[in-house]
Amino acid sequence: MSVRIFHPTVAPFVQQAARAIHEAGHLESYVTGIRCDPTSRVQRCAIAAARLVRYDLGRQLRRRTVTEVPADRVASYPLGEYLRLAVGRLDRDGRATDFVWEHTEHHFDRRVAAGLHRGLSGVYAFEHASLATITRARALGLPVAYDMPAPESTFTQAILDRETAQFPELATPWHRWTAAREARRIARRHAEFRAASVVIAASEFTRRSFAPAGLDPAKVRVVPYGAPPVAALDLAVQGGQPDHAPLTLLWAGTFSVRKGAHYVLDAWRTGELGRHARLLVFGAVALPDRVVLPLPPGIELRGSVPRDELMEHYRTSDALLFPTLCDGFGMVATEAWSRGLPVITTDHAGAADLLRPGNNGLLIRAGDSAAIADNVRWCLDHRTELRAMRESAHATAAAWQWRNYRGRLTEVLREAGLFSS
């Protein structure tokens, strides 16, 4: 009774799924791309070679550390990910990186498929990275759990197409490149979905996106992602800025079209929000300079920072601004709640399943700069009420930890027959 789980990355939700299977006593292996291994001579040599071109490969490898399952259960097929990193270092607009990503992900899938055998009791797969493996597993009579972190791709692409049609200045060569290839990628995801025994989604928002595309929502089970360990309650409640200081909002993650960044810029410009509020943006900027510049007063682009530093900024900020147009969950929300930070988000965020408006955050319309401005002004005028949300925000994270996610996922996999002999 053993399950093989595979994904080219070591993302937190992937590792937590692997840990759930391991804790249930059914993990045969977790197959991934690059896995940080300080004992590896190859990795040490690669790090040294990268220094010659002033590239901190060691930092990239440390971000790919597997922490949730024993090392002897982890298998690594790293060449594709190394190639993607190398190309990404030289790529100016993302198209070459996207090309390499697609082809190396398919190669990874084929390698995993080739290693399947009848001694397994099931396979845990992820979207777009698993068609060959799912096909092989079903031929062997193995049940397959298929994890879809994001909403159905036709739905997502329609949102992006609408935004670039309404705001042509948002379009980039990367957007045009990926849009031209999306039909075949959608077909691949649909084939994976239909062949799977059970589909795992992180939110009701994601589950609802499937039926309009002709995909059966009856096979979908919703298992929300867990929150990180919570800060001490007194530290969380006492966080934020004093009332005499400017309101400080935080943005975590890519500053992009899909996340609604262009609406934030418009809200700051037209509403002159920078007079009394700051927005600290932590993450890469994926909007064209012609959209971002000149940067509105009050918005500060801080770039990417180490996780510990970001978590402290969650604690010392007044609210998280997460006006996404389409997000299967949005782990930035649970990260924020774990530090007592109220969340301002939309009904197009899967994490809104856990949001109680006026209690642990605020719910706004997606794609509406006026709604963003109105809610920022509400925060400015109601600092006491906003601060009072911190205790409820902390309680939200404490009530649904990763252990709760793993427990629910284990139940789903058992019901789907992946743990049967």
Listing of model-derived features with the role each one plays in the protein:
Residues 46, 77-100, 140-187:
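Acceptor-binding helix/loop patch of EC 2.4 sugar-transfer enzymes
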Residues 193, 312-317:
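Short alpha-helical donor nucleotide-sugar binding micro-motif in glycosyltransferases
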Residues 236, 240-259, 265-269, 280:
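Conserved donor-binding/catalytic core segment of Leloir-type glycosyltransferases
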Residues 289-311:
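Nucleotide-activated donor-binding/catalytic signature segment of Leloir-type glycosyltransferases, i.e.
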Residues 325:
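Aromatic "clamp/platform" in nucleotide-sugar-dependent glycosyltransferases that forms part
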Residues 342-345:
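Short hydrophobic beta-strand element within catalytic cores of glycosyltransferases
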Residues 357-358, 362-368, 378-383:
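Conserved acidic donor-binding segment of nucleotide-sugar-dependent glycosyltransferases
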Residues 385-399:
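A short, well-ordered alpha-helix in the C-terminal region of glycosyltransferases
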